[in-house]
């Protein structure tokens, strides 16, 4: 969908502008065979891929570097339990259209479901005087929580028509940066116009703006990728794709969005991630090598599968 510049001030306030800039462009196609091979190695108990080289996972570091979504802020949660759309509107915005009047004979007027534009214009034409300037929500942790939950569900499906949701761009770029399996060739990138605003500069995902397309049959590729993952060695893994030391986060070939490093102090948090009804734990201590740190021993085994996945916020 073509981006409309009139949205910019409203998208920039909650910290979503870098991500919207990214996804409003043409993003690389999903390599379904690689995703399926990764799902086979996902463990919902640890929220990590169990590979021959050890555990690996998508962390808040990857969320910042690839999407630049804000991590710090209010959790993205709301009640999802209601008796209908009117009750949901009242819970979210404090009001809803009135019920249709009852006609003679006990029947209600037939009206379309949802709030009509005339009602929206009458009630929201002007910003309330007591409205907050901005509310920053933790969209980054919500995106990771939902991706974790989708991987949790997908790895336990037994039907052939099962799928997976969440931010597949985040998962794809994470995989391409770290693993040689199914990695496409990055040829170049389209021109990026940041309009002179550093916040509109690209994220790390821009490295994969234009990639080679997968032409082989999916089932054959899946078998090939499965074999390649079974033979992975630590030397083949790019443990720190974003660099290390003073060169960390330097793409060398283009200027990156400054927001990607703004919340680096939060990347090693062991905390619950919340996305509405999904609550998932962030466990970076299990993959310390991804942060350039020494992993002295395997973390203690804690099975969160049953207890954690009973938690719901709605």
Residue map of PLM features:
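Structural stabilizers in ordered domains
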Residues: 1-314
């Amino acid at each position: 969908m073509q981006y409309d510049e009139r949205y910019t001030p409203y998208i920039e306030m909650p910290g979503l502008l870098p991500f919207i800039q990214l996804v409003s462009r043409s993003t690389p196609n999903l390599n379904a065979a690689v995703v399926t091979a990764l799902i086979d190695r996902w463990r919902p108990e640890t929220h990590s891929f169990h590979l021959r080289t050890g555990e690996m996972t998508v962390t808040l570091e990857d969320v910042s570097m690839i999407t630049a979504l804000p991590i710090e802020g209010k959790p993205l949660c709301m009640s999802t339990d209601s008796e209908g759309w009117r009750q949901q509107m009242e819970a979210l915005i404090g009001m809803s259209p009135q019920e249709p009047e009852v006609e003679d004979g006990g029947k209600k007027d037939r009206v379309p479901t949802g709030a009509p534009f005339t009602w929206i214009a009458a009630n929201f034409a002007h910003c309330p005087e007591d409205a907050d300037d901005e509310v920053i929500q933790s969209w980054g942790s919500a995106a990771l929580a939902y991706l974790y939950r989708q991987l949790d569900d997908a790895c336990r499906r037994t039907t052939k028509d099962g799928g997976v949701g969440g931010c597949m761009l985040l998962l794809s770029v994470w995989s391409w940066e770290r693993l040689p399996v199914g990695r496409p060739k990055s040829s170049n990138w389209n021109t990026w116009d940041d309009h002179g605003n550093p916040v509109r500069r690209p994220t790390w995902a821009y490295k994969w703006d234009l990639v080679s397309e997968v032409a082989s049959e999916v089932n054959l590729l899946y078998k090939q990728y499965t074999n390649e993952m079974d033979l992975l060695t630590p030397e083949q893994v790019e443990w720190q794709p974003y660099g290390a030391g003073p060169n960390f986060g330097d793409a060398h070939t283009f200027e990156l969005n400054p927001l990607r490093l703004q919340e680096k102090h939060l990347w090693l948090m062991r905390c619950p991630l919340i996305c509405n009804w999904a609550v998932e734990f962030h466990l970076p201590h299990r993959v310390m090598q991804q942060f350039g740190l020494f992993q002295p021993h395997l973390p203690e085994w804690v099975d969160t599968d049953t207890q954690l996945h009973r938690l719901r916020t709605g």
